[in-house]
């Protein structure tokens, strides 16, 4: 039996067959090798040509094709038969990387025999590739009519199969104008009534593609099937567009004529209410318009038909300057004065789009010039703001009386054409309008003159022309509806040259209705050049106040203009408070204007700025306090300036750093300055307390703050704390001696220790140690009484806050139990009560002593950690108690025969002990098991295993994990906690110390020698254990070299800019003298970068001028989109 090929899978898989071997070549093999190698025993000549074509094979390999694809594309029918006979039927429809089957490849290469053979073998003709194209679509696209015929004759072929965008093969045939293929498809049952994704029928595609032969076949076939030509040619798609609309879009005159001859309705409208005529008018297709108008037989006025925007054909032609078309439309009766939905006539629309041929044509034809759009503008309003202005019109038109009368016509806002020309800055239009004796004092509804507009938009040449012939300064100083003069508007927008011109012409420094001067407006925008012009002219205007008491400094600070603030300070502007008691520095801080604050800090008037505030203002406090709250990074910079290193080398012994504390000394300095009548009380260490309040760790860790606290500690803190600790030890040490010297349980009184035996009930008085014991008892008693007095005084001082501190409750317990312990000195009390109180007293005495030590840095941080870990334990008490109850009661039920578990209370205590690791497995569980004392051994050991897993493993690890996490958190914020305690200690001490003493020990600065020891050997040893351990920080290295270089480059650029401006003015003068006409004469836009930026911000605002400006800058070109077929 003849062996065939084994099943062929995807390329790049090895196929082994008897007689035929197909090897896919991997990517790692040399590209010079054959991509595919087919060895066939016998019949080698038949495949010789196929194997030799390496270039094609390489291409096929890249496209991931299999041998059947190659054979189908090359027309190798015998090889295809050989491959198919040795494989399964699936190989017929195998796809390559693009989704193409062998039938696709055969159709694409116009291999008719391959197509026939594949179809005869059962290939599926309805499979589509990635581009949604079937073999029939590919054949139609390539115009392979024989292949089309073969495919359509096959019974399995779906002739109406949809491809990309829902297009059938019939539609693709119309796009190619292949009438022969169309005839074949129609004969085989292709549907003309099937539409694509956009609702287009084949008749639409034929009209758009200009396929006249296909169109004739389609109409004839439709007529044969009951659709008249007129009905068929007026089919519409989803957009209600007819074939005539699409034919006009393509611009094919013959197709349009064919559509009209077959009854296409010219007055049919699509969704946008546009007829095909409107499309043609937009394109400027005069021949098409003439054809359609001459072919129209309806009763309506087709020439003046309007679209959805109420625009006629003449509007469309005027918009795009189609002069010939407009002239033809006028000749056939087009209404030259019709208006669209926005009230625009063709004349206004042509003027707005700079279609000057149309404008002059319409004026010649007698178009009305007094028609206004919905904004009240006539055509002259739009003409004057175009480049070259009125020069675009013929000279004879400007002599017409009805056009001259328009120069004073106002729009809805009361603006005349002169206002428009001044706003846009067209000197030619301004000169022409002034030549008609137009009044420059005309006002708009918001009381703005043309000079207001020119000044607002920086039109320097226009301002010069307007001010050229004035005899008084009334125009210069007139205010608009808001009281703003041209000087205000020019300063507000940063036009320094205009400001300089206005000031030279006599403009006054007036205030608007809000009390704002020109300097207020310039400072609000941060225009330093404009501010300099104003300040150089009138220096006294720096201190002018508005209605809220704000100066120009307030405005510049609020908007964050640091350079403007620096300039005003350099011009010695007064630092004043507004009506809200806020200086410019308060406003900058509240608005978080970092650059403004940093600029003020670096200014030489910083100390003056710092002192301007009121002590009784709740929201505008001392600027230092506000800086800590709102801008801590600026406070850090200020503290950096308080560190002044010496000029010596850092490794030298004489190298020192001076720490200035003047910005941390608010309490003392303010106490001296606050008037006695003002009820203002400042807390000691106010600045540091504000840092603690707002959690400013980086500021508290700053070297200046650390040195400040160290100075306080050395001045009085260490002494006071040691005195407090010493007074506490007066009770602690005697109490400790009493507990150590006297045997617990023995009674004692003032006479001595009473030694008694429980067997004989005899008592013996020990008088040998009676005197020292008596002294210790008296000291404990007196220290406790002293403690009582101290606590009572603190209650009156701290009031409610006293009861919020748990340390105070602890001291009451200590003093009470201590007095009870030594009460036998005066009264006889039972010994058991005496020693129980003694145990409590000595415990809390030493625990409270531990809290005293947390004031010291080296050991205090560990005490804080111990406190945090204890709080973590308390948070887990809920879980802890429930586990204790669960296992304790369970063990009571199972092990109640043992003494340790005999009662529920004892069982709970024993379980608690087991939680700490004292499980006692042998005595409690193992030996009772061997003695058969366990009533429920399995349950008992199961409970033991559960206890071991939950408590020693899970619960303890949980507590350890929480403790480790809290320790890491405490270490992270250890600095803040330690310094906060130091600040609290010094604050409380300064509240109690007299002012004269504080003035004596307080220092405004200190000098530290980092390379020298600060204390003697004994003191260093003592400070190592108890005192603050300084971690010196380097002085911030502020390298100003880069800043200086940048500043030099800045000044060089300013010099170059000034030089270029002078050269520009010189060139302009030369051009004027030589009477050279240049397009630049019409440009009136001399703006700096900041001026242009401000102008862009203004133009982005919602305004009625926006679409006019856009039309002036660029002429819009209409691009009509058509559907993709």
Curated annotation (Swiss-Prot):
Disulfide bonds join 193-666, 463-666, 609-622, 622-666, 634-859. The chain crosses the membrane at residues 722-742, 768-788, 807-827, 833-853, 877-897, 938-959. It catalyses: Ca(2+)(in) = Ca(2+)(out); Mg(2+)(in) = Mg(2+)(out); Na(+)(in) = Na(+)(out); K(+)(in) = K(+)(out). Expressed in inner ear (at protein level). Specifically expressed in a subset of nociceptive neurons. Expressed in the same neurons that TRPV1. In contrast, it is not expressed in neurons expressing TRPM8. Expressed in the superior cervical ganglion of vagus nerve. Expressed in the inferior ganglion (nodose ganglion) of vagus nerve. Expressed in dorsal root ganglia neurons. Electrophilic ligands activate the channel by covalent modification of intracellular cysteines. Cys-622 plays a key role in covalent binding of electrophiles. Extracellular Ca(2+) both potentiates and inactivates TRPA1; a rapid potentiation follows by slow desensitization. Activated by increase in intracellular Ca(2+) concentration. Inhibited by the potent blocker of TRPV channels ruthenium red, A-967079. Activated by icilin, sulfhydryl reactive agent MTSEA, N-methyl maleimide (NMM), and PF-4840154. Also activated by hyperoxia. Activated by intracellular Zn(2+). (E)-cinnamaldehyde binds at residues 415, 422, 622, 642, 666, 712. It comes from the Eukaryota. The record marks 623 as: Key residue for activation by the scorpion wasabi receptor toxin. The modification 4-hydroxyproline is found at residue 395. Keywords: ANK repeat, Calcium, Calcium channel, Calcium transport, Cell membrane, Coiled coil, Disulfide bond, Glycoprotein, Hydroxylation, Ion channel, Ion transport, Membrane, Metal-binding, Oxidation, Repeat, Sensory transduction, Transmembrane, Transmembrane helix, Transport. GO terms for biological process: calcium ion transmembrane import into cytosol; calcium ion transport; cell surface receptor signaling pathway; cellular response to caffeine; cellular response to carbon dioxide; cellular response to cold; cellular response to food; cellular response to heat. A 1,2-diacyl-sn-glycero-3-phospho-(1D-myo-inositol) binds at residues 1048-1054. The record marks 918 as: Crucial for calcium permeation. Residues 1044-1073 form a coiled coil. It is found in: Cell membrane. GO terms for molecular function: calcium channel activity; channel activity; identical protein binding; intracellularly gated calcium channel activity; metal ion binding; monoatomic ion channel activity; osmolarity-sensing monoatomic cation channel activity; temperature-gated cation channel activity. ANK repeats lie at residues 63-94, 98-127, 131-161, 165-194, 198-227, 239-268, 272-301, 309-338, 342-371, 413-442, 446-475, 482-511, 514-543, 548-577. Glycans are attached at residues 749, 755. It is a multi-pass membrane protein. Ca(2+) binds at residues 791, 794, 808, 811. Residues 1-721, 789-806, 854-876, 960-1125 are cytoplasmic. Belongs to the transient receptor (TC 1.A.4) family. Ligand-activated Ca(2+)-permeable, nonselective cation channel. Involved in pain detection and possibly also in cold perception, oxygen concentration perception, cough, itch, and inner ear function. Has a relatively high Ca(2+) selectivity, with a preference for divalent over monovalent cations (Ca(2+) > Ba(2+) > Mg(2+) > NH4(+) > Li(+) > K(+)), the influx of cation into the cytoplasm, leads to membrane depolarization. Has a central role in the pain response to endogenous inflammatory mediators, such as bradykinin and to a diverse array of irritants. PANTHER family: ION_TRANS DOMAIN-CONTAINING PROTEIN, TRANSIENT RECEPTOR POTENTIAL CATION CHANNEL PROTEIN PAINLESS. C-terminal helices from the four subunits associate to form atypical coiled coil structure; this region is probably involved in binding the inositol polyphosphates that are required for optimal channel activity (in vitro). This is Transient receptor potential cation channel subfamily A member 1. It comes from Mus musculus. The lineage of its organism: Eukaryota, Metazoa, Chordata, Craniata, Vertebrata.
